[in-house]
Amino acid sequence: MKKLLAALGAFTLLPAIVFANEEKLKDGFYSFDAMGCMLLRECTEDVEEVISLLDVSSKYEHWEEFTPFSAEFNHMLSSLNRVGVRVFLADEKYFPVGHRGVYHTVSNNFFLNKTFMRRPSVLMSVMRHEGWHAAQDCMAGTIENSMIAIIMPEDEVPMLWQEMAESTYRHMPHAIPWEKEATWAGKTQGMTMKALDACANGKMWEVYPPTPLTKEWLTEKGYIK
């Protein structure tokens, strides 16, 4: 098991302007330095907490296109909030080029890149993907620690999603086991919602029996007997 900072993304451009808070950042905005500042909640300008889907959809003219996804989105958000995870919509300046969202295993918050959330399908994919990482955090004993564990045996992940994750995260090979199932969950309606329900209801290991290695670790740490 390893600490994991997971993110997906698409292309963005760096404007030639100066933002407030930039003096805090050694590498400026659109960098991992900026992302770290956001994750630690030291940079909060243009970072707004999401209380319901309306907090996202209202930012765009085509807000009505988000409506079909409201039940699943709000259900996931409710489960996340129940276990102490907060979700934020943040300006693109806090994300390195190519990042659409990120879950932080230490603060237990995740952040959505406002620029890319204008498409409902992308919003749901990122919400499910990052939400799955929160569920992996829950699988590793408790949301309170900074560890994550795979939820399903790797061979149960359909080959399509395994290959996609191996390609997308080829430069982060240590992350691939976690990203395989997160990629699958990101594209599958209801999958993350179910896992977050299990986490919020204290039934994670009942609904998803731990893999042998995870069970061994959970037993060693005293989470299960």
Please place each PLM-identified region on the residue numbering.
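Short pre-active-site segment immediately N-terminal to the catalytic Zn-binding motif
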Residues: 110-127
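Cleaved targeting-peptide boundary
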Residues: 19-29
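Metalloprotease/metallohydrolase-associated module, dominated by Zn2+-dependent proteases
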Residues: 146-225
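A mature extracytoplasmic/lumenal domain signature
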Residues: 91-93, 114-117, 138-141
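Catalytic Zn2+-binding segment of zinc metalloproteases
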Residues: 131-148
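Auxiliary, metal-adjacent structural segments of Zn-dependent hydrolase domains
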Residues: 21, 33-106
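Cleavable N-terminal signal peptides
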Residues: 7-8, 18, 126
